[in-house]
UniProtKB/Swiss-Prot annotation:
Main location: mitochondrion
Tagged with keyword Ribosomal protein: no
Keyword Methyltransferase attributed: no
Disulfide bond positions: none
Subcellular localization(s) per the UniProt record: Mitochondrion inner membrane
Quaternary structure annotation from Swiss-Prot or TrEMBL: Component of 250-400 kDa complexes called cytochrome oxidase assembly intermediates or COA complexes.
Alphabetical keyword list: Membrane, Mitochondrion, Mitochondrion inner membrane, Transmembrane, Transmembrane helix
Family from the record: Belongs to the COA3 family.
Protein name: Cytochrome c oxidase assembly factor 3, mitochondrial
Induction behaviour: Differentially expressed during meiosis.
GO BP: mitochondrial cytochrome c oxidase assembly
Chain segments annotated as transmembrane: 20-42
Domain of life the protein comes from: Eukaryota
Amino acid sequence: MNQGNQAFENARKPFRRANLITALGLGAFAFATFAYSVYRVHEDTFEDVVMTPELEKKIAEDRDLSKKN
């Protein structure tokens, strides 16, 4: 069984570096996309969102409740 395991490891050896580089590249891309999204949302002021009086009242009530807790 040990000989089969050694053959398996030898067969995988040439692909380890390429697989690692690919995995790191995909991970870096995913992290960069997430970081960029957070950055863009953080700088948005949401001034273009229309607030109805009912919604403003509900938000004020929720803020008061969260301050009490």
